[in-house]
């Protein structure tokens, strides 16, 4: 930012595509989000599989396997070869071995495929009551995304599988585009959106916890504009050149903050003009 905010080496490395192994942002991605999530899924799966009610928990186990595969998908995409481990506990004296990107890709595809077989279709559930849990269609959509880059991950293209996964979702006739782009992101849509295939529900009464996107995408002064219970981190922003790429009347502009802004009481505050930001 022109104000000096977020002007640190980790961010600058990412913007310049010159990232070193000790980059703090990547360490956070790896050590705070991806692998703690994978580890939690391992523990939950092990607990359910050890339960005397295991046979009644097949769908829940499948759903957790899909969430774990989702974490491994991003780990594979970001880092390539990563430790592949599915046990509940890690032995500090026998750490998990690193698997090749292809091996992780094959694991992700297998887990998604087997999970989808045990999950209900969106056509089989009460959409409101089941929201926001995973359905077959949510997993098929994730698989389509994985197959899109199969040639990079495993050295072999899978374009036909991309089409097959998408056809599974489209064939339900359960989804359609919203009238406006922004309608997908309404706080009130919950299970009502016909476009959202999979979502992570966040309780607004818990503040920003679990939804860091809103924390990092808003200006600090938006706390007063929207009467927020927290102060946004003044994070992501865009350049004037990027803004000018949108034609007048483009409804996506409604999702962006630019130009003069106002507090709820009508008092104006002005966003800092950023010329060379990231």
Segments predicted by a language model, with ranges:
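Proline-centered turn/helix-capping motifs that create local helix->coil transitions or kinks
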Residues: 5-6, 75-84, 206-207, 262-265
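A structural signal for well-ordered alpha-helical segments within the folded catalytic domains
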Residues: 35, 39, 106, 137-142, ...
């Amino acid at each position: 930012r022109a104000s000096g905010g977020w002007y640190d080496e980790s961010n600058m490395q990412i913007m310049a595509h010159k990232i070193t192994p000790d980059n703090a942002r990547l360490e956070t991605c790896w050590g705070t989000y991806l692998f703690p999530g994978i580890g939690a899924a391992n523990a939950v799966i092990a607990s359910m599989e050890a339960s005397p009610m295991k046979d009644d928990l097949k769908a829940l186990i499948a759903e957790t396997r899909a969430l774990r595969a989702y974490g491994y998908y991003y780990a594979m995409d970001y880092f390539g070869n990563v430790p592949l481990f599915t046990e509940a506990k890690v032995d500090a004296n026998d750490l998990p071995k690193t698997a090749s990107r292809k091996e992780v890709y094959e694991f992700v595809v297998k887990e998604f495929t087997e999970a989808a077989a045990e999950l209900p279709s969106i056509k089989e559930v009460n959409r409101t009551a089941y929201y926001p849990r995973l359905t077959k269609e949510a997993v098929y959509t994730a698989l389509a995304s994985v197959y899109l880059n199969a040639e990079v991950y495993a050295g072999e293209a899978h374009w036909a599988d991309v089409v097959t996964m998408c056809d599974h979702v489209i064939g339900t006739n359960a989804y359609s585009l919203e009238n406006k782009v922004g309608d997908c992101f309404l706080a009130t849509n919950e299970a009502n959106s016909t476009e959202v295939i999979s979502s992570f529900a966040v309780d607004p009464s818990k503040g920003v916890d679990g939804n860091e996107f809103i924390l990092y995408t808003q200006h600090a002064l938006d706390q007063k504009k929207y009467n927020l219970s927290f102060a946004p981190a003044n994070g992501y922003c865009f350049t004037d050149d990027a803004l000018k790429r949108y034609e007048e009347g483009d409804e996506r502009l409604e999702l962006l903050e630019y130009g003069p802004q106002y507090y709820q009481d009508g008092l104006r505050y002005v966003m800092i003009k950023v010329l060379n930001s990231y």
